[in-house]
């Protein structure tokens, strides 16, 4: 029997929701929906070790609103019916359950983690007073909140791991307010030696708990503790010391880990790119790249015959793949060509020269390259390459330290990396910033932030050809740290941005853009004047994400 909970419990603003919990009784050949459809996201499932009809489901609930069901649910009849478990657990309609785990020797002892979070287009509530760690010793009838040794105040995401041979030893990844002073228990790793009644703070560690935040204790040797995030924090002395190790799993972000209870050298990792297996305690890894789980954001095509399709994937770079091959087995993995790193997004190929390819990485990094010679040039608009930059922003540049200020010296902005452009904070770039090649002139390109940029020399120089085309509602603008207990703004939270651009071969001066906050803007004179035509659209809610605008190539005005 296999149980599957649907909906992504990692709280990115791109997280998908599901339709409840599924059950298979034939080893996965067929599945039946067993209910809990309105929970949207189920974070954990635990089956009673002595009675398989008793199943607990940790429902974190709707990410984008306080509707639907959330909390801890239980079935006593194999899923035919469900009840919400209360008895002291949060029931405020805002706090969901993210963790449920049985004591390995006594299933009457259960631990649950609760978490309050809410995403809005330009903000993120992560953490609250009602959440935290809860323990039951009477099979879930009553619960008490555990606070001894833990950080004071609000709590966020929680993950727990219990040692199998000695269940008194437990470890926990616990999110708290990052403003807690150093030296006091805060966000990071905790350990318990008395079955979860009290906790000791071991390590301050906060790498996007809402997205990573997993922890595992070696089932055989409790001295080995693994904190799973972007890379690992590892202890081999029971938490007295930790070191960071970026295992060469080639998986991008790591999200979950399983260690075989019978052999602690066997480990599985769940990553953005698939599963990884180690049989030597992480020294080497085998990548299972045979899963069809690639997540494309956007694609482009060239004019070769056979044509190539280029596209960017979540944490798997940007690739180009032919539409045909001479291989009798068809198109194989080896026919694809890696062209850029990171989170990959828009890929555009010069229609007159297939060797010239434009690639976009997350949050506004765009590059031009010759895919034959591998000559690579970053062309993101910067104060140095925007010809009319000072018409929009006044700034002073400190060349000796590669930084600039917009408020004479009060706040300095540094280049993120030496090989990457300097992005002024006035320009808000979407996680997937739109880039197109003009349908009128292959040397003309457009790039969107909250303003529209135009280049007539393939991105070497830029001109801002619009005001802020978004609503730029300052009352809704995100905080710089994302709004969570710990810094959660990784760029994906940027809002009030342009997300789609289109021009038309019928008239080189007509350009359309759509924004993530509902605007549809058009210029008929190459940016001199703009008109928001959003209100001309009936029956479409305000602030709706305009995912695509496509100007007709055949009829003017359409």
Task: Identify what each model region corresponds to.
Residues 1-558:
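Beta-propeller blade termini and top-face loops
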């Amino acid at each position: 029997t296999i149980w599957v909970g649907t909906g992504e419990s990692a709280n990115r603003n791109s997280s998908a929701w599901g339709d409840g919990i599924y059950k298979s009784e034939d080893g996965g050949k067929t599945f039946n929906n067993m209910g809990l459809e309105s929970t949207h996201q189920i974070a954990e499932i635990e089956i009673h070790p002595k009675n398989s009809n008793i199943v607990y489901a940790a429902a974190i609930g709707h990410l984008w609103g306080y509707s639907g069901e959330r909390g801890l649910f239980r079935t006593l009849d194999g899923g035919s019916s469900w009840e919400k478990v209360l008895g002291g657990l949060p029931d405020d309609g805002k706090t969901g359950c993210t963790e449920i785990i049985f004591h390995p020797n006594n299933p009457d002892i259960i631990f649950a983690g609760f978490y309050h979070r809410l995403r809005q287009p330009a903000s993120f509530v992560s953490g609250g007073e009602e959440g935290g760690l809860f323990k039951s010793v009477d099979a879930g009838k009553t619960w008490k909140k555990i606070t001894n040794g833990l950080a004071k105040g609000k709590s966020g995401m929680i993950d727990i791991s219990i040692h199998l041979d000695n269940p008194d030893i437990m470890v926990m990844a616990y999110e708290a307010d990052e403003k807690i002073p150093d030296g006091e228990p805060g966000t990071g790793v905790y350990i318990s030696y008395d079955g979860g009644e009290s906790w000791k703070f071991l390590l301050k560690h906060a790498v996007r708990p809402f997205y990573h935040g997993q922890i595992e204790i070696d089932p055989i040797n409790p001295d080995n503790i693994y904190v799973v995030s972007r890379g690992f924090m590892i202890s081999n002395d029971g938490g007295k010391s930790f070191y960071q190790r970026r295992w060469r799993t080639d998986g991008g972000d790591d999200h979950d880990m399983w260690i075989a209870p019978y052999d602690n050298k066997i480990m599985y990792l769940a990553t953005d790119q698939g599963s990884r297996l180690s049989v030597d305690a992480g020294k080497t890894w085998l990548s299972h790249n045979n899963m069809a789980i690639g997540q494309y954001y956007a694609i482009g095509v060239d004019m070769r015959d056979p044509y190539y399709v280029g596209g960017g994937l979540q944490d798997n770079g940007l690739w180009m793949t032919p539409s045909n091959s001479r291989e009798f087995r068809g198109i194989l993995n080896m026919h694809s060509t890696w062209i850029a790193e990171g989170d990959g997004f828009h890929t555009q190929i010069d229609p007159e020269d297939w060797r010239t390819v434009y690639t976009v990485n997350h949050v506004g990094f765009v590059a031009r390259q010759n895919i034959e010679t591998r000559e690579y040039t970053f062309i993101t608009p910067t104060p140095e390459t925007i010809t009319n930059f000072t018409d929009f922003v006044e700034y002073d540049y400190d060349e000796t330290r590669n930084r600039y200020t917009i408020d004479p010296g009060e706040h300095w902005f540094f280049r993120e990396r030496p090989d990457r452009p300097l992005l002024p904070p006035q320009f808000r770039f979407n996680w997937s910033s739109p880039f197109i090649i003009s349908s009128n002139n292959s040397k003309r390109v457009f790039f969107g932030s909250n303003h529209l940029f135009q280049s007539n020399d393939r991105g070497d120089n830029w001109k801002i050809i619009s005001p802020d085309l978004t609503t730029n509602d300052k009352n809704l603008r995100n905080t710089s740290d994302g709004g969570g207990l710990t810094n959660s703004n990784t760029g994906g939270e940027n809002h009030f941005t342009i997300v789609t651009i289109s021009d038309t071969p019928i008239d080189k001066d007509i350009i359309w853009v759509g924004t993530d906050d509902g605007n549809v803007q058009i210029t008929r004179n190459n940016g001199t004047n703009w008109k928001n035509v959003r209100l001309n659209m009936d029956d479409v809610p305000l602030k709706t994400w305009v995912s695509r605008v496509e100007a007709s190539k055949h009829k003017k005005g359409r």
